[in-house]
């Protein structure tokens, strides 16, 4: 009988032929059952022809899958962008003499210099944290591969001992074997480091962030409307403040003429 992809098979109906063999590594999969050939009375569905493999993820892979699944559907209300690799991390601090003269003669320049150096320090911290996390991740991968190789070697040694009729008691120290696994704790610390790095960001829209925090979960169209109203209000206030001075200046100029 023909096996169509995705069909359900009912062995209580129809005529069935003899079991058929499938090529190596090919299985008939019907629901939660799998056969290395086509049986005379398969049950279940949907049925497919495919290959089977063993899934044995470690703690690192499981945490990556959970992290990717938890990030879906997350809404960001604040317009805070994270620092990228293109930011400048060249920190050049002023000496005491330059700070004193700048504070006395040009306070605005001193404040701008301080803000710029703070931004560069934040960029330097983010890059260092990213490098540290990447380095520790590579070391964890190496340790995981070494652990896997050690377990394979131990299994081969046990097999050879049993094949020659010996046990672990014949060789000192072979009966006790403890290989600790701290990958789960290390992965948690990696996640904490990434969370701390993500706390450093640049607020590209402070007015919008302030309005979102003031009015709660309002829509973006309302944010743009409120920003337009605030801009119009600021322009009106500037006109109210500056227009009398401008009119007075024009009138005094005309009188002198």
UniProtKB/Swiss-Prot annotation:
Which GO BP terms sit in this record? fusion of virus membrane with host plasma membrane; symbiont entry into host cell; virion attachment to host cell
**What stretch or stretches form a coiled coil here?**
112-162, 180-210
Give ranges for the Extracellular compartment. Answer: 1-229
Glycosylation positions in this chain:
15, 58, 68, 130, 178
Site residues (Cleavage), renumbered to this chain: 78-79
* Pfam families cross-referenced by the UniProt entry: Avian_gp85, TLV_coat
Self-association or partners: how does it assemble?
Answer: The mature envelope protein (Env) consists of a trimer of SU-TM heterodimers attached by noncovalent interactions or by a labile interchain disulfide bond.
Q: What is this protein called?
A: Envelope glycoprotein
- Origin organism of this chain? Avian retrovirus RPL30
